[in-house]
Amino acid sequence: MSKFTWKELIQLGSPSKAYESSLACIAHIDMNAFFAQVEQMRCGLSKEDPVVCVQWNSIIAVSYAARKYGISRMDTIQEALKKCSNLIPIHTAVFKKGEDFWQYHDGCGSWVQDPAKQISVEDHKVSLEPYRRESRKALKIFKSACDLVERASIDEVFLDLGRICFNMLMFDNEYELTGDLKLKDALSNIREAFIGGNYDINSHLPLIPEKIKSLKFEGDVFNPEGRDLITDWDDVILALGSQVCKGIRDSIKDILGYTTSCGLSSTKNVCKLASNYKKPDAQTIVKNDCLLDFLDCGKFEITSFWTLGGVLGKELIDVLDLPHENSIKHIRETWPDNAGQLKEFLDAKVKQSDYDRSTSNIDPLKTADLAEKLFKLSRGRYGLPLSSRPVVKSMMSNKNLRGKSCNSIVDCISWLEVFCAELTSRIQDLEQEYNKIVIPRTVSISLKTKSYEVYRKSGPVAYKGINFQSHELLKVGIKFVTDLDIKGKNKSYYPLTKLSMTITNFDIIDLQKTVVDMFGNQVHTFKSSAGKEDEEKTTSSKADEKTPKLECCKYQVTFTDQKALQEHADYHLALKLSEGLNGAEESSKNLSFGEKRLLFSRKRPNSQHTATPQKKQVTSSKNILSFFTRKK
C-alpha cells in the first residue's frame, strides 16, 4: 500500500485544505531580473544585450547578460560602465513635479555628459507603474491557468496546483503517457475506486501502477543520490505539476517575452528556495524524499527561509547557538524528536537574566509556535496556505526632497499632485488584480522641515459615490498642507526635506456580490409556508410532502426552489431602494398604514366627494435597472 491516504489525495480538491496534504503541489515562479526584462522588451533589445535599469545614480536591476561582466546592484552606474563599455543603461520612468502623469526620458540620465539630458532629482520622482502594468499582464496569465494564485511581490507568485493535478489524475482522458498509452488506462483502477466510492477516507491509497512510472518530469529534479524518480503518489502529483508549470511559463514567454524560474515542492518555503536554486529560465523540482538532501546541499541556512532573513533570523542564530554553516541540519540533529524539546530550550534562554527582552524579536508567549515552525522548517514540512485576498493596510507615496524643490505651499501642492497620481495608479492596480472596489477612507500628510522637525495631519476623505476619486484625495491633501503651512512662517520650516501622503482605512467591496450580499438581508419578508397549521394538515401527495414551498408574504407568491425565491427577494430590495431614492407611491406595500396617511394625506378626497381613483398602469417588466431611473 501507499504511505498516503485517500484523505490526503482528496484534500487536493479543496483550495483551503490542499496545503495541509503531504501530496500538496506548490509552485513559486519568479520573473528573472524583471525590471531589466521589461526595459529590454520595451526598447526592442535582445536577451544578449547587457541592460541595467537605473534610478538616479543607482542600479536597481541587472540583466543576466550584464551580470557576466561582474555588474551587480551594489555598483553605481559609473562603476558599471567601467566594467562593461557597451553597457546599456535605461532610467526608470519618472513623474515631474506638478504633473499627474509619468513618462520615460530615454537617452537621459546621470551618466550622460550633456547637462540638458540630466534628470533632476529635485524635480522628478520615480514611477514603477510600467513594471506594475507588466506584472498585471503576467498575473492575468497565472490566474487564467490556476485557481489559487498568491502574488508574493511585483515579480513573483505562488501557485497551488492541487486541483489541476487532482483533475488530471482522476478525470483527464486525453493525456498520453507514451505514444500508445494514455493516463486514463494506467490509472483505471484508482479512478474506478474513486468514482464508485469504493474506498475508506482514512485508508491508504493503492500502490502506484507500474505503467505510471513512465510519467516524465519537466525541469530538473533535485536528486543527488540517484533515487527512483516515481515511487509513490506524491511523485506522480509533482510530475503532473511540473508539466503544468512548464506550460504556464511557456505562455508567459510566448505572450509577454519574459523568462521565469520556477520551484516545485510540497510547501511554500521549499519551492521558493527551489526557484532561486537555478536561474535564469529554469525549473527545479524537490521531491519529498529529497527534501533533506536539498536543505543540506550547502546553499541554504536557517536565514534563507522566507520570514527569517532579517533580524529574527540573526537573533535565532545567537539564541540557539547555531553554526554559521549547516544551521538547518544542526537544528534537526540537536532537537530530533519533537518541537517540545526546542521550546524548552527557547524558554530557558528567554528566562536567562542576561537576556535583553527590550531588543528581542522573540515573543516569550509564543515560543511554542516558533519552536514548531523551526522544527518543521528544518525538515521541509512547514506548510503555509496561499492567500489570493488583498491585505491592504496602507499605501504611501513620498519624496525625499533636495535643495529648494519644496520651498513654498505651491511646491507642496505640486508634489501632492504627483503623489495622488501615483496612489491612484496603485489603487487601480489592486482593483484590477482582485476585481474589487478599493476605497481609502483616511489620508495623512507628513512632512519634515528644514530643521528636521516632523509635522503630521490626518483626517477622513469623503467621496461622491462608491468609487475612489483622485481629486477628492488631492482636495483633502491640499487642505492639510495649507493648515500645516501656518508653521511655515518660522524660518526653520522651508525648504522641506521630506513630504509624504499616506492612505489607510480601506473599504474593499467585492464586485461579484449580489445586491442582497452588498446591502445585507435588510428585508426579511420571506418564510416557509410550512407552519403550525401545516403540521396539523395531512396530504395525500408524497411529492408535495417532500417539496419545500417558500412563500412571499407581500404577494402570497409560492416558490419551489431557493433560486427563484432569491430573485424575487432581489426584486423587493431593488424596489425599496428605488423608493428611497425616487420616492414611494401610495400603492407601495413597503409603507405602513400610518406612513401612507402621513405622506399622502393631501391626496385623500373628502368624504362628501368620493370618487374611485384610477389605478396607475403597471408595466409587466420588472427589470431591476428600471427601479433606479428617477421618475419624471
UniProtKB/Swiss-Prot annotation:
Residues 625-632 are annotated as: POL30-binding. It is found in: Nucleus. The lineage of its organism: Eukaryota, Fungi, Dikarya, Ascomycota, Saccharomycotina. Residues 607-626 have a biased composition (Polar residues). Belongs to the DNA polymerase type-Y family. It comes from Saccharomyces cerevisiae (strain ATCC 204508 / S288c) (Baker's yeast). Pfam families: IMS (PF00817), IMS_C (PF11799). This is DNA polymerase eta. Zn(2+) binds at C552, C553, H568, H572. Mg(2+) binds at D30, D155.
